[in-house]
């Protein structure tokens, strides 16, 4: 793949990382509306980061003629497709806030291990030279969700057995077609799962605070 395509990829992801909200790791005592706003903002940013990373990886490594057939096979690859989580806004509206928070926590925690291997793939990236920053963003969102669960339950968040599930690590052998397809699938799942977490948080914020924007 041409060097300029990969350079565009690195710059896109690096810029998104720089735009991460300041003091992202801080979730001090604050009103419930602020806890929701902060969590939604972080989920939106992570989802955008995941979507743009997937798109640029696709441009750099996946031939256009193969993308459609590969994408059709990726749904079954995602661990999140095997759990009874809502698949969209309408289904999410039928669940309680605590159910949505637990599903959101599950989705975030399932990626905490795999993202630590991103640095083995994107060794020349300004942002992915180390995976620590992506990991920190996920940990920050995890803390925000746990803060919401504590606020709503008035106690420590409960984590069930389903939270033990996780994804495979990314494959560093970028010269292997199998590794490229595996990483492509993982990035697709990362994008889908972050979209779900963002949707759940926005549904909760919308129905709790009428002043919130519900057009999404």
From Swiss-Prot:
SUPFAM superfamilies: 4-helical cytokines
Phosphoserine modification, residue list: 131
Keyword Phosphoprotein: yes
Residue positions binding Zn(2+): 45, 198
SS bond list: 78-189, 206-214
Xref: InterPro entries: 4_helix_cytokine-like_core, Somatotropin, Somatotropin/Prolactin, Somatotropin_CS
Any Gene Ontology biological process: regulation of response to nutrient levels
GO molecular function, one term: hormone activity
Annotated localization: Secreted
GO cellular component: extracellular region; extracellular space; nucleus; plasma membrane; secretory granule; trans-Golgi network
UniProt main location, coarse: secreted
Leader peptide range in chain numbering: 1-26
Family according to the record: Belongs to the somatotropin/prolactin family.
Annotated function: Plays an important role in growth control. Its major role in stimulating body growth is to stimulate the liver and other tissues to secrete IGF1. It stimulates both the differentiation and proliferation of myoblasts. It also stimulates amino acid uptake and protein synthesis in muscle and other tissues.
Protein name: Somatotropin
Gene from which this protein is expressed: Gh1
């Amino acid at each position: 793949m041409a060097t300029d395509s990969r350079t565009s990829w690195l710059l896109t992801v690096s810029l998104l990382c720089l735009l991460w909200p300041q003091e992202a790791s801080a979730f001090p005592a604050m009103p419930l509306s602020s806890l929701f706003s902060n969590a939604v903002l972080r989920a939106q940013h992570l989802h955008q980061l995941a979507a743009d990373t997937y798109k640029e990886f696709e441009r750099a490594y996946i031939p256009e003629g193969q993308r459609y057939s590969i994408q059709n096979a990726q749904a079954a690859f995602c661990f999140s497709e095997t759990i009874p989580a809502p698949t969209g806004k309408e289904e999410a509206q039928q669940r309680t806030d605590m159910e949505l928070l637990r599903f959101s926590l599950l989705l975030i925690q399932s990626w905490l291990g795999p993202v630590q291997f991103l640095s083995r793939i994107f060794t020349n990236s300004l942002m992915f030279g180390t995976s620590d920053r992506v990991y920190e963003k996920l940990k920050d969102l995890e803390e925000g969700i746990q803060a919401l669960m504590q606020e709503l339950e008035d106690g420590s968040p409960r984590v069930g057995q389903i939270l033990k599930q996780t994804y495979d690590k990314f494959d560093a052998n970028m010269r292997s077609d199998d590794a490229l397809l595996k990483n492509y699938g993982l990035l697709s799942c990362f994008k889908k799962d972050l979209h779900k977490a963002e949707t759940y948080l926005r549904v909760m914020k919308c129905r709790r605070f009428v002043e919130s924007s519900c057009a999404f």
